[in-house]
Amino acid sequence: MTKVCPEIEGTLSLSVVPVSVDVSFASDHFPTYKLGPDNQIVEEPKEDEKGPSVKETVEKESELLSDQHKRLSVRDLASKFDKNLAAAVSLANEAKLREVASLEGHVMLKKLRDALEYMRGRTDGQNKQDVETAISMVEALAVKLTQNEGELIQEKFEVKKLGNFLKQTSEDAKKLVNQEKSFSCAEIETARAVVLRLGEAFEEQERISEASRAQGPDVEKLVEEVQEARQIKRMHHPTKVMGMQHELHGLRNRIQEKYMNSVKLHKEIAIIKRVEESKSCPFVLEGKQSLGSCLRIRVNAQDNAPDLSNCSIQWYRAACETSRREAISGAIQSMYAPEPFDVGRILQADILSNGQKFTVTTDDPVDPDSGLPSRVESLMRKSNSEFSVVISQMNGQDYASRSHVFTVGKTRIKLSRGWITKARELYSTSMQLCGVRGNIKAPTKAVFWQPRKSLTFILTFESEHERNAAIALARKYAFDCSVTLLGPDD
């Protein structure tokens, strides 16, 4: 029986690829790896790893920078940016060193893989499997190294970006520092100028106060003299003023007396003149010359007296005897009842008889009714004022009627009886209202009213006072509506 023993080589002669002496490693020993699922090589964590990674450091610094940005002053911010810029430069240098180490790792892994490939071709059996396993681990290390290089490139890009940002921010901070410095210098100069001006003003004030203290006695003397002069003026001035006031009062009294004497003389002359004329005038004017009364023309001569009914009569009103007269349209009868428009005026009547003209005149202007203004004021407090009237004529024809209500409003006049309205018109230029001027009973209580063209009324009031109040009130309301409410041709 033959026993076969396999030949086992005691030593394998391998050609080792030389490694460059310039290669630098991150550590002094080979890292520890283990196989994970699907034959993936997983690097075991290093227990002696010192400090965080570059990415964590950059993130931490960025967070601190963003948190403290609002709280730092401009100068502190610039100093912080300078420190961070230096840290970013050091991190960039460290990344460059790691990039060089990564490149050397690739070279070393390439050489190691080539050596393992060479050994795989020279071995068989279990050793060959171990070599193939080692080759797989080397390839996995190469992939891991490539991934680390990608992360390193990304970190390098972020570090470079952060460095540029910090550099630009540092320059901006320096500009802000310089700008604030210039502003501060300008404010300091302004404050210094203000302080100088205040100092000059205080010095000027002090000089003025010293000068005033030096001139104190003279000023006190002047003040005493002024006070004495004022006292003398107060003692003598009122007496002089009172004397002048007494003189003016005496002059006014004398002028008033002379005026009254002149008016009295004019009246006496007018009376004498009218008496002389009345001796030759067969007519005379009688009646109270005031509002609410009635003036009548009477025949004065007894022998050869003309018949008044055969005479032509026309009444006039004038401001005075010598002024221009205004004919009263429709006043052609022997009697005439003055209305509020005649107050303060002289009334005259021309009488034409047998070709001769005679004139009768009131002695004085027509006197007003003392209670009329207060009555009108009380009525104006109401929105409408109502008066009881009787229609004597309508459109020139006699009209027998019962009592009606004559309503004078702020914008219109209405004549009604109960629910029946005879006339209702707004104030207009076609409306007329005045005392009656024709031959009618009780002319002192009657008015002529034309609401519109082709419609006229003769209305009789309960009293002379009511008649005059209605006329005055209606004219005031019409004047407020920019309408002049008078009689025909007034």
Curated annotation (Swiss-Prot):
List cystine links: none
- Protein name, please? Stomatal closure-related actin-binding protein 3
What terms describe the molecular function in GO for this protein? actin binding
Q: Which organism is it from?
A: Arabidopsis thaliana (Mouse-ear cress)
Which InterPro entries does the UniProt entry name for this protein?
SCAB, SCAB-ABD, SCAB-Ig, SCAB-PH, SCAB_CC
The job of this chain, per UniProt, is described as:
Probable plant-specific actin binding protein that bundles and stabilizes microfilaments (MFs).
Query: Which body tissues produce this protein?
Result: Expressed in roots, stems, leaves, siliques and flowers.
**Can the keyword Cytoplasm be found in this entry's annotation?**
yes
Q: Which GO terms describe its biological process?
A: actin filament organization; circadian rhythm; regulation of stomatal movement
Can you quote a single GO CC term? cytoskeleton
